[in-house]
């Protein structure tokens, strides 16, 4: 199951890269390279060959690849002199057959359908996570709702939260970018968004829901019935 969870994320990034024409891929790794956005600008799906990571780091330091790498733990990047860990996430999964959502849909949750919606999602996500999300990318990727759906939480004309569900080729639904802005925290918005995404996953007849949780978020998702598996780590590669 751990690999299926990772594959959902990698497949989502690959899907984005193809939609925006920025996917780099070969037998050893994949990358989405964008200048105008921090998301999903990175290298991923790296093969386990002995010298692959060193080659990728050389390409990054030569400005030929994005300087962010996401890999499963354990990884030799932990001890590499030119890498700096800045994000750890727990891989989690939930069998949707065990899930019944009792609460009603929250009317404040709106699906992204227009360019304006996409720009508002990007601004909300940027405020929630502290890195730049480009609305043009969101709009291009949101066009096929059978593959991916973007949502915002709008209350009293203020955008307070966001979330994404991505349906992969293994019939798993990945929950991504569930976040709240500083003004939206402590109001249960993340829980409401998670419930909405779970409903969409069940409506899609997905087998499992998968996600990648921070240390703070892991216990929240366990309350929904998610089980923890392995870990992902994201590193920034430093210049020489």
What are these regions (language model features)?
Residues 1-4, 49-50, 108-121:
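A short beta-loop-alpha structural element at the N-terminal edge
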Residues 1-63, 74:
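N-terminal charged segments
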Residues 46-107, 113, 235-237:
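Acyl-donor-binding surface of acyltransferase catalytic domains
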Residues 51-56, 180, 186-199, 203:
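Conserved acetyl-CoA-binding loop-helix of GNAT-fold acetyltransferases
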Residues 62-72, 201-213:
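Conserved GNAT acetyl-CoA-binding A-motif
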Residues 75-85, 191, 215-232, 238:
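Conserved active-site alpha-helix within GNAT-family acetyltransferase domains
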Residues 132-181:
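A conserved beta-strand-loop-helix scaffold within acyl/acetyltransferase catalytic domains
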């Amino acid at each position: 199951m751990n690999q299926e969870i990772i594959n959902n994320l990698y497949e989502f990034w690959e899907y984005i890269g193809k939609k925006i024409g920025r996917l780099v891929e070969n037998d050893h790794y994949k990358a989405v390279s964008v200048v105008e956005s921090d998301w999903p600008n990175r290298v991923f799906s790296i093969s386990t060959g002995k010298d692959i990571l060193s080659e990728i780091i050389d390409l990054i330091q030569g400005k030929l690849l994005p300087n962010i790498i996401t890999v499963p733990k354990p990884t030799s990047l932990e001890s590499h002199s030119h890498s700096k860990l800045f994000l750890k996430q727990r891989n989690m999964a939930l069998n949707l057959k065990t899930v019944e959502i009792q609460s009603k849909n929250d009317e404040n949750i709106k699906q992204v359908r227009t360019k304006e919606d996409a720009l508002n999602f990007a601004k909300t996500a940027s405020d929630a996570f502290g890195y730049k999300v480009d609305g043009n990318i969101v709009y291009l990727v949101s066009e096929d709702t059978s593959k991916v759906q973007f949502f915002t939480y709008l209350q009293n004309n203020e955008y307070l939260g966001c979330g994404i569900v991505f349906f992969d080729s293994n019939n798993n639904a990945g929950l991504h970018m569930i976040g709240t802005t500083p003004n939206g925290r402590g109001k249960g918005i993340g829980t409401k968004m998670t419930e909405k995404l779970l409903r969409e996953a069940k409506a899609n007849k997905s087998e499992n829901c998968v996600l990648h949780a921070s240390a703070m978020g892991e216990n929240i998702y366990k309350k929904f019935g998610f089980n923890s598996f392995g870990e992902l780590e994201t590193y920034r590669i430093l210049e020489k």
